Amino acid sequence: MAPANFIALAVHMIWLPLSRACNAVEPKTSRVFPAILIFGDSTVDPGNNNYIPTLFKANYNPYGRDFPGHIATGRFSNGKLIPDILASTLGIKELVPAFLDPMLSDGDLRTGVSFGSAGSGYDDLTASRSRVIPMLKQIDLFKNYIQRLERIVGEEKAKRILNGALVIVSAGSNDFILNFYDIPSRSLEFNISGYQAFVQNRLQSLIQVI
């Protein structure tokens, strides 16, 4: 029950402010947030894993069968991801692109991207086992994003965009499913309560860095 309570709490904390924001704006008429920035796992990866050597990919059928154009973009979904729906509802953009997409436009950078990588987690060991982008590397990509944004819009406007951006972090289940319950190293080091506290501490550290 501990991991489930943690996930439910995270969803509750994220949903309340977003539900107010969605009620405060007519879709596609005005923006509450100038940009959206995403960190996490397969729940928020729009295709970053397409550009790294990992088995955790979703750029083939049946993924994307309900996506516009019926294209498998790398999203672990038959259609859009939650960040896409939020970005559209909040009037930011129709789709949140992958930061590693080489076709990323200046307009995409102005309105935000996702650094998420399917198979990742708060525990670096989780991402290492899956050969995907760990959270700390996602932070490095975020720093690179800031530099690119500053070159496009200037330092002052970049600060305004970043300060007003909606930031979403979605991860944690892989730390338990692909790590704690699947390989012995962490389960020998922690009991379930101890590992939950470890993951929560990693989340808190990540938020402080962001």
Where in the sequence are the language-model features?
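Conserved active-site regions of diverse hydrolases
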Residues: A2-I210
